[in-house]
């Protein structure tokens, strides 16, 4: 099974996989889901999936939740799909592990 994240220590970048549910009651990251033997973090977002509103809210929410600059968060795959790959730039591996461990129950 592929895990939901991959860290590159030479570039200090991480790729994370999310299963996004737009038009939710609240913005929330909650545990994992497995689809086609790939692990995804579940992410609920209040914004509707129209004209990039949900994607913008994903970036804003992750930046606020993880105390990162919005410019260091980029959706690189899945702009119009619920399965998204998000690039996190300029992140320390220890800090990434701290973030990840907060969602492992």
Swiss-Prot record:
<protein>
    <recommendedName>
        <fullName>UPF0235 protein RrIowa_1526</fullName>
    </recommendedName>
</protein>
<dbReference type="InterPro" id="IPR036591">
    <property type="entry name" value="YggU-like_sf"/>
</dbReference>
<dbReference type="GO" id="GO:0005737">
    <property type="term" value="C:cytoplasm"/>
</dbReference>
<dbReference type="Pfam" id="PF02594">
    <property type="entry name" value="DUF167"/>
</dbReference>
<dbReference type="InterPro" id="IPR003746">
    <property type="entry name" value="DUF167"/>
</dbReference>
<comment type="similarity">
    <text>Belongs to the UPF0235 family.</text>
</comment>
């Amino acid at each position: 099974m592929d895990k939901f994240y991959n860290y590159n220590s030479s570039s200090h970048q991480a790729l994370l996989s999310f299963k996004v549910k737009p038009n939710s009651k609240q913005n929330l990251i909650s545990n994992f889901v497995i689809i086609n033997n790939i692990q995804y973090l579940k992410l609920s977002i209040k914004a509707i999936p129209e004209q990039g509103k949900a994607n913008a809210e994903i970036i804003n929410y992750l930046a606020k939740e993880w105390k990162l600059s919005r410019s260091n968060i980029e959706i690189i795959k899945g702009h119009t799909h619920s399965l998204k790959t998000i690039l996190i730039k300029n992140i320390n591996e220890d800090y990434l592990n701290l973030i990840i461990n907060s969602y492992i129950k």
